[in-house]
């Protein structure tokens, strides 16, 4: 039975804007209050999905969430008609309006942590929705994310859905952005690598400038929920010093595929025992770990963050080599591009690079890896997935036409209070649920 890594990319929402909501994400802060183009953002994402599908990779689409999140505003004490609520919140709390209008669910690497059937004791694929409780604008995503995943992976024989962990600091969970899987074929047992920023109970090393969003306790809880064998799980601490330089998730400083771990020299807390444990566990599944460590002398942490070199997709090719999917910013950084040029000619596993323009997402701090949720599936499981979300030439055309019909080509903060934007969004999402055969996944569809 064949195995695949299926990438489910988030479709950028209609309220995509630059509000600087994500403290610790330097691109988000740098582009605060600049003009956004939601239509272009959505099309840039769709082009990447289509290009990878055309190369033969399994590619799915995850829909955006309803924004502004009117239910959240009502929960926070705003009342009256939708028009009255928007008018009041823009006057009394403009930052709150921006937060409940964020299109951040596009970064589906934070949607959930996923464990394949080959790794779980019950032989099923497990999903735990991330609580994202470090940032309010992201913490409000969990319920709709859960509804979306349950609609797409809707077969209890193959898929298990867990609620988000308790939304408290001790169990801060950022999903797959702090999770890697190392092994061989995708349908064979592998080692799951959970990367955390701090320990809630024991304390220890922590960043001082920016928050460590993922806790060890959260990672351990997810491993338990997913029924993982402790001998096939490793918990690694991210280097607090790089968090303080803008590495707010591990996928900004490392990426893996099969038996290859591509990471910066300073990505993790130096601990030879952890790497020895990882190599030992890899040996038990008859796999040899291949690490590609990028020296700080060639690419600094600052250059890695500004270029998003590691916020890339590492994909297996038919010839046994690997393709690295990078944002245009990596090509534009001389040190990074020089390193990559050497890398693909070094005889190692990575022999090709593909560059994508994702600038609208990148200005908010989200590159190729942020935009996708990896789900390893076998043939039977893939057949059980809602096929309407899988990228095809016909779906690409349908979604592009949908974007052209519904998305604005410029958006400023003042537009978020426009009741017409809310109605445009609801009409668009209602139509999208029909295109993707998702059912009623949005709150407004239950009014």
Curated annotation (Swiss-Prot):
Active site (record annotation): 174, 249, 370
Keyword Glycosyltransferase: no
BP GO annotations: arginine catabolic process to glutamate; arginine catabolic process to succinate
Pathway where this protein functions: Amino-acid degradation; L-arginine degradation via AST pathway; L-glutamate and succinate from L-arginine: step 2/5
Ligand binding (substrate): 19-28, 110, 137-138, 213, 251, 364
Coiled coil segments of this chain: none
EC assignment: 3.5.3.23
Keywords: Arginine metabolism, Hydrolase
Superkingdom, taxonomy of origin: Bacteria
Record's catalysed reaction(s): N(2)-succinyl-L-arginine + 2 H2O + 2 H(+) = N(2)-succinyl-L-ornithine + 2 NH4(+) + CO2
The protein's enzyme class: hydrolase
Molecular function, one GO term: N-succinylarginine dihydrolase activity
Function: Catalyzes the hydrolysis of N(2)-succinylarginine into N(2)-succinylornithine, ammonia and CO(2).
Family: Belongs to the succinylarginine dihydrolase family.
Subunit structure, as described in the record: Homodimer.
Protein name: N-succinylarginine dihydrolase
Source organism of this protein record: Yersinia enterocolitica serotype O:8 / biotype 1B (strain NCTC 13174 / 8081)
Gene (UniProt): astB
């Amino acid at each position: 039975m064949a195995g695949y890594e299926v990438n489910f990319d988030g479709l950028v929402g209609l309220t995509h804007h630059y509000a600087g909501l994500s403290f610790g994400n330097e691109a988000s802060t740098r582009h605060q209050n600049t003009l956004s183009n939601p239509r272009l953002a959505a099309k840039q994402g769709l082009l990447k999905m289509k290009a990878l599908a055309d190369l033969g990779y399994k590619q799915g689409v995850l829909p955006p969430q309803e924004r502004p999140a009117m239910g959240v505003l009502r929960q926070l004490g705003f009342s009256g008609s939708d028009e009255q609520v928007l008018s009041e919140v823009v006057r009394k709390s403009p930052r709150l309006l921006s937060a409940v209008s964020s299109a951040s669910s596009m970064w589906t690497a934070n949607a959930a942590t996923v464990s394949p059937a080959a790794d779980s004791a019950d032989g099923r694929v497990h999903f735990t929705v991330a609580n994202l409780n470090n940032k309010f604008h992201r913490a409000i995503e969990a319920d709709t994310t859960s509804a979306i995943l349950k609609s797409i992976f809707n077969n209890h024989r193959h898929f298990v859905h867990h609620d988000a962990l308790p939304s408290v600091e001790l169990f801060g969970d950022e999903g797959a952005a702090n999770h890697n899987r190392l092994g061989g074929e995708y349908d064979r047992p592998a080692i799951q690598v959970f990367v955390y920023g701090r320990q809630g109970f024991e304390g220890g090393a922590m960043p001082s400038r920016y928050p460590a969003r993922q806790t060890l306790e959260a990672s351990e809880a997810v491993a338990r929920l997913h029924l993982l064998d402790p001998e096939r799980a490793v918990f690694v601490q991210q280097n607090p010093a790089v968090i303080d330089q803008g590495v707010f998730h591990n996928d900004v400083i490392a990426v893996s595929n099969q038996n290859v771990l591509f990471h910066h020299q300073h990505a993790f807390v130096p601990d030879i025992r952890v790497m020895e444990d990882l190599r030992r566990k890899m040996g038990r599944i008859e796999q040899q770990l291949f690490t590609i460590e990028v020296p700080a002398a060639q690419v600094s942490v600052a250059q890695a963050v500004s270029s998003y070199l590691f916020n890339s997709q590492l994909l297996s090719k038919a010839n046994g080599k690997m393709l690295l999917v990078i944002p245009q910013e990596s090509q534009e950084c001389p040190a990074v591009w020089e390193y990559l040029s050497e890398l693909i000619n070094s005889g190692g596993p990575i022999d090709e690079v593909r560059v994508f323009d994702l600038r609208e997402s990148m200005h908010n701090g989200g590159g190729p890896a942020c935009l996708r949720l990896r789900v390893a599936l076998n043939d039977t499981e893939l057949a059980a997935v809602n096929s309407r979300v899988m990228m095809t030439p016909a779906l690409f055309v349908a979604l592009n036409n949908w974007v052209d019909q519904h998305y604005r080509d410029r958006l400023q903060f003042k537009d978020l209070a426009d009741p017409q934007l809310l109605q445009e969004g609801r009409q668009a999402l209602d139509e999208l649920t029909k295109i993707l055969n998702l059912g009623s996944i949005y709150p407004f569809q239950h009014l």
